[in-house]
């Protein structure tokens, strides 16, 4: 008998729930690190959907850890304050004055807003930075521009991770929301690329998955050819493709390669423009975006 139009939505919902069961069992008790950025961080509907996804994971016995950046928000605040901003080699040149703004925006605005959205579902989220409990130790980095090593100020890479700072929050059934600021060995605070920080944290926590939210459908092996979108790729193939990728995708792909090469079972580049993209990727057979696995 053909289901009636009224009965169909209920049947579809039941099918989706049944499809999610094996994935829920697989991920129960596991840590999933999510790099939060792009449109998912600026569109109100997507922000609320993402926050609901985090609460859903927590209530299913999965341990989400959110790492966020805030480039567009930092740029907007610098403009409002009349502070000049410059980029070299794809990185923001970070003077002490720019760093003060970055700290204010990352932890005081972007992180606070996400914590509040998640906590609308219950007392779950706790905002921290890489400065707290020595979560991250940074080492200053430079970039190469036209073959010349170039200083970009207070910009760092993650040198060490104190996983206990986050594991203690997970043990208390909290959702850590991490702003990517970190001191170096001398205590000088640096701004850290959020993609890099997410990969380092996933590795240190022994995460089951690393999810990278982007503003594209996934990884294209020959952009702008839409037919080149791949649903799964191994690290060897992806490493060969890396030099040919669009500049904006390279830090995300490097983060995926780092995490999977360090033992994280899979990393996922997913479309953050899709409502509840995290749930779609984790709990449906088709998923969304591109899965990176070990060779």
Curated annotation (Swiss-Prot):
The family this protein is said to belong to: Belongs to the acetylglutamate kinase family. ArgB subfamily.
InterPro entries: AceGlu_kinase-like_sf, AcgluKinase_fam, ArgB, Asp/Glu/Uridylate_kinase, Glu/AcGlu_kinase, NAGK-C
Gene3D superfamilies: Acetylglutamate kinase-like
Gene Ontology molecular functions: acetylglutamate kinase activity; ATP binding
Pathway in which this enzyme or protein is active: Amino-acid biosynthesis; L-arginine biosynthesis; N(2)-acetyl-L-ornithine from L-glutamate: step 2/4
Gene symbol of the encoding locus: argB
Protein's recorded name: Acetylglutamate kinase
HAMAP family cross-referenced by the UniProt entry: ArgB
């Amino acid at each position: 008998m053909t289901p009636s139009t009224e009965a169909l939505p209920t049947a579809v919902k039941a099918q989706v729930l049944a499809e999610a069961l094996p994935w829920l069992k697989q991920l129960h008790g596991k840590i999933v690190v999510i790099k939060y950025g792009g449109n998912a961080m600026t569109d109100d509907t997507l922000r609320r959907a993402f926050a609901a996804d985090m609460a859903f994971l927590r209530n299913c016995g999965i341990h989400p850890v959110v790492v966020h950046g805030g480039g567009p928000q930092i740029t907007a605040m610098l403009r409002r304050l009349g502070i000049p901003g410059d980029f070299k080699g794809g990185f923001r040149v970070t003077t002490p004055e720019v760093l003060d703004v970055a700290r204010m925006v990352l932890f005081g605005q972007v992180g606070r807003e996400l914590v509040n959205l998640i906590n609308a579902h219950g007392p779950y989220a706790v905002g921290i930075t890489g400065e707290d409990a020595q979560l991250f130790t940074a080492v200053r980095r430079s970039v190469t521009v036209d073959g010349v090593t170039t200083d970009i100020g207070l910009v760092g890479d993650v040198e060490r991770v104190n996983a206990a700072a986050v594991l203690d929050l997970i043990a208390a059934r909290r959702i850590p929301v991490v702003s990517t600021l970190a001191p170096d060995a001398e205590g000088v605070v640096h701004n850290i690329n959020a993609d890099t920080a997410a990969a380092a944290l996933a590795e240190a926590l022994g995460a089951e998955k690393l999810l990278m939210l982007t503003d594209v459908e996934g990884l294209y092996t020959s952009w702008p050819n839409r037919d080149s979108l791949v649903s799964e790729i191994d690290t060897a193939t992806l490493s060969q493709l890396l030099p040919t990728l669009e500049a904006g995708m390279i830090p995300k792909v490097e983060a995926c390669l780092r995490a999977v090469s360090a033992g994280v079972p899979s990393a996922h580049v997913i479309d953050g423009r899709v409502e509840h993209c995290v749930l779609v990727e984790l709990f449906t057979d088709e998923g969304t975006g591109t899965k990176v696995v070990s060779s």
